Amino acid sequence: MVAPKSHTDDWAPGPFSSKPQRSQLQIFSSVLQTSLLFLLMGLRASGKDSAPTVVSGILGGSVTLPLNISVDTEIENVIWIGPKNALAFARPKENVTIMVKSYLGRLDITKWSYSLCISNLTLNDAGSYKAQINQRNFEVTTEEEFTLFVYEQLQEPQVTMKSVKVSENFSCNITLMCSVKGAEKSVLYSWTPREPHASESNGGSILTVSRTPCDPDLPYICTAQNPVSQRSSLPVHVGQFCTDPGASRGGTTGETVVGVLGEPVTLPLALPACRDTEKVVWLFNTSIISKEREEAATADPLIKSRDPYKNRVWVSSQDCSLKISQLKIEDAGPYHAYVCSEASSVTSMTHVTLLIYRRLRKPKITWSLRHSEDGICRISLTCSVEDGGNTVMYTWTPLQKEAVVSQGESHLNVSWRSSENHPNLTCTASNPVSRSSHQFLSENICSGPERNTKLWIGLFLMVCLLCVGIFSWCIWKRKGRCSVPAFCSSQAEAPADTPEPTAGHTLYSVLSQGYEKLDTPLRPARQQPTPTSDSSSDSNLTTEEDEDRPEVHKPISGRYEVFDQVTQEGAGHDPAPEGQADYDPVTPYVTEVESVVGENTMYAQVFNLQGKTPVSQKEESSATIYCSIRKPQVVPPPQQNDLEIPESPTYENFT
């Protein structure tokens, strides 16, 4: 090139000198272009003419590495080589040969284009792939290269607060970080909205925002994307991370307001020119309640979604105070009010602390007896209120000198002597909004002098009533007996065939008062062979007895005797006539009616009501019925073994 230029300068220009020169340049350019074309064709034929084709796949999905081979091309064979070694070998009209077992069932080659298809992608499948294509009647092997990237399907990005810094002008510098779980590479991050007060760093995954309480609380959204997917995060309000800039730099605690659970409360701001104020913002935890001039109070959308009660919190249009209805326990805490100017700067700040208490129920007192000895009663009392919490104060009245109070004054140990009056203790539970008390009666635990006196009086009255009852019963029974006459049977009527009684057969009768008689007729004497001189007289001797007195029949010594025995009450009777025998009692509390047919003698035996003691039996050989009268006398108690009939009884004949 240099020689022609120098040579051209020495020649003088002529009329046709320029044409030969142009034709030489054209010829040279044509030769150069032809050479470059063959060079490019050779490079393309060897497969080194272009960069690898980039292909992206999703983890667990499928991908195809395409080959642009026309249908008319005669292919001898195609070999696919993976990141480490040969993968597959394919020939026309033959089955594909898989050379790596880890790809069995996941790898395939299309029939006409010989493209490579991989399914169920894994992270190990990423890398470089090469296809060697051999054509018939063509000596050069054509190569195609691919680069495979395998990406995960992105999950929803998560935004976290990394740091908060508070400046002196009530502003906060909040740093947010966006991340996607399981995706650390090839992920691009972006934030919306883009504001002049916000800046991004670290590939867009970190956002730093500077704001004041008076600035609008805009929602920030993080978007993450990779070649196969794109996801966005939930809106994040940075105002929730900077709700107390004044207190963070040492502001005052302000006023304390006490509220009652379930009732309304007002947090005062005392701002007379509330209507002329540009904006008032109340902050509480993650809640923001703001009111702009000539507008109703608005709450953060995040607050409304969490609050089941609509319009439960609002800012008063009169003095910009914060009003809360139906207080909940979670409403307690610090509140901060900021008054803003037109330039969104803070002009004043107020702190209010809200405390919430329950109205107390009636206290419950439980007690346990420690021990009671030496006349001293010692007990432990515990006072508690259901759902009272840790803010309940307990007091005991009256409080003795020896009493011991513990566990926040809810536990009391007290003692007293049995000779002392029992103290009635009162537990009072109180909190800042309510007060309730309950009295404990200690007389129900240990017996004292008053209780002993009452016990003895009660026992005495019971004994008196019992005695009066017994005495009344005895009087009633006595009157009942005296009203019924007692008598002995008169002479029985003899049957027609029985002769009249003779002098040797006399019937005696005795009239007695106040004695019990057997109400069961005597059993007749059994018929036995007797002499003709004996008269059989049915005396029909009948005595009356209480219905509940059983009747007993008992044989004695082979004879049957019927006793009509009556004992007369009173001590003012004349002594018994001569021959009258005093008989000792026989077998008390048993009524016996005996009939004996032996020597024509019949006796009847009756018990009195007082002692239930029978009179001894007597024996006689005559056919006579006797009544015996016994005078009251003091007789020693009978012995069990002394139930014998006197050997020589004497009777008096009243005939």
Curated annotation (Swiss-Prot):
One of its GO terms (cellular component) is plasma membrane. A motif (ITSM 2) lies at residues 624-629. Residues 48-158, 251-363 form the Ig-like V-type domain. The chain crosses the membrane at residues 455-476. Residues 159-235, 364-452 form the Ig-like C2-type domain. The modification Phosphotyrosine is found at Y603. Keywords: Adaptive immunity, Cell adhesion, Cell membrane, Disulfide bond, Glycoprotein, Immunity, Immunoglobulin domain, Innate immunity, Membrane, Phosphoprotein, Repeat, Signal, Transmembrane, Transmembrane helix. The gene is LY9. It is found in: Membrane; Cell membrane. This is T-lymphocyte surface antigen Ly-9.
